[in-house]
Amino acid sequence: MFTNIFFNILAAVVFLFIFWKKLKEDYIPNQIFSAAFSAILGVLLANILIFNFFPSWWFWASLIGFCAGLTISIYRFKLRFFEVLDSSVIAALPWLLIIFLVNSVAFASTSSLVASVFILLLISIYLFSDAHYRKFTWYKSGRIGFSGLTVVGLFFLTRSLVALAFDNVLSFVGKTEIYFSTTLAIVSFFAIYSLSKKEI
């Protein structure tokens, strides 16, 4: 228990730093950290509410709480949605990485180790696309949001494909996982298509 608390605190600190670093050029620290803490608070509250009833739904509860916290901050501080999306995705990936790594060590879980490698791959994809997406000829608008949406789309597409074969992976909720993850993957890729057509 104490190990989980320690590594979650560490992950939260990493999340806060990356989130601040990505947004510090456009927003004041008060806005950035208020949004970040709102997201973290949303995750905590969602997990507290669901822990005694549906503990296996911790990932989806965390995602809903996280998004709710950010959404409130976006409206409160008039933040730009896709800037926040991009920043929150790359800030949250290390948190997921730490969760899977800790689980792989604590329970000798091969699936969690594979998930850790996958998260590292997503981080690499994000960093590459963030550096080069404005050069993609088909992405004419050059609008921010491409990197975050690409990673989100790939993340949930992969979850849906894995859920077709396995349902005992950490954070999965059986075959229901397929429908939720597929929907979010489709929405993400459609959002990329829509963004590519818009002028800056």
Task: Give short role names for the model-derived ranges.
Residues 39-82:
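A glycine-rich, hydrophobic loop/mini-helix early in the fold
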Residues 35-47, 89-105, 143-159:
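Small-residue-rich segments of transmembrane alpha-helices in multi-pass membrane proteins
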Residues 65-140:
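Membrane-proximal helix-loop-helix units in multi-pass membrane proteins
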Residues 23-29, 33-36:
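Hydrophobic/aromatic interaction determinants used to assemble and anchor large protein complexes
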Residues 5-25:
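N-terminal signal-anchor/start-transfer transmembrane helix
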Residues 21-22, 48-53, 99-107, 158-169:
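Juxtamembrane "helix-exit" motif on the non-cytosolic side of transmembrane helices
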Residues 1-12, 49-67, 110-121, 179-183:
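Structural signature of hydrophobic alpha-helical transmembrane segments
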Residues 108-200:
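C-terminal membrane-adjacent module
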